[in-house]
């Protein structure tokens, strides 16, 4: 392996297991160069405002990646759940399979619930059911009958605060 081209094979692995992110250094450089060269073309097609937004995002990614690499190189970030490793893809003696670690899950215990007889039934409160009086159907002027009475204008329905259900029924009847 040529020592001068050794940095071209770097891969940055973020996390461990099948959900880890692998950042290929040459691909990252090609992406940065491509977005830099596409700037003038995008400026003609899209406009200055969106190109400025893309430029800001590009510089944020570049600065963030530099800070990230410096942090990894100084081994500042050594958490158990967040593992980062930089390795060359052509290193001898290492296999390319990703070994998965068991996920840490919280232990849960199920508690049997007591059966409540009132739940699922509709016996929370009694609804008084009254029989409707027989009404004479309204006959329209053209001779056809209608079940609904014509509106007589604003009706005055006696409402009481004590029995809301009866108020609802009375309002529905007089509507």
UniProtKB/Swiss-Prot annotation:
Subcellular location: Membrane
Transmembrane segments: 21-41, 50-70
GO terms under cellular component: membrane
Record's bilayer topology term: Multi-pass membrane protein
Keywords in alphabetical order: Membrane, Transmembrane, Transmembrane helix
Principal location listed in the UniProt entry: membrane
Miscellaneous notes: Present with 1200 molecules/cell in log phase SD medium.
UniProt name for this protein: Uncharacterized protein YOR097C
Species of origin: Saccharomyces cerevisiae (strain ATCC 204508 / S288c)
Taxonomic classification: Eukaryota, Fungi, Dikarya, Ascomycota, Saccharomycotina
């Amino acid at each position: 392996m040529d020592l001068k081209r050794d940095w071209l094979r770097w891969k940055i692995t973020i996390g461990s297991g099948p959900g880890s992110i692998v950042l290929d250094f040459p691909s990252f450089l090609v992406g940065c160069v491509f977005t830099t060269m596409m700037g003038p073309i995008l400026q003609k097609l899209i406009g200055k405002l969106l190109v400025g937004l893309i430029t800001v995002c590009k510089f944020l990614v570049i600065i963030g990646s530099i800070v990230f690499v410096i942090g990894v190189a100084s081994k500042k970030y050594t958490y158990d759940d967040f593992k980062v490793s930089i390795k060359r893809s052509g290193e001898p003696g290492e296999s390319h399979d990703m070994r998965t670690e068991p996920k840490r899950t919280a232990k849960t215990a199920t508690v049997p619930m007591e059966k409540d007889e009132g739940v699922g039934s509709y016996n929370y409160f009694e609804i008084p059911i009254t029989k409707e009086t027989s009404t004479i159907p309204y006959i329209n002027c053209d001779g056809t009958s209608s079940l609904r009475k014509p509106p007589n204008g604003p009706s005055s329905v006696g409402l009481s605060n004590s029995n809301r259900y009866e108020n609802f029924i009375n309002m529905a009847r007089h509507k």
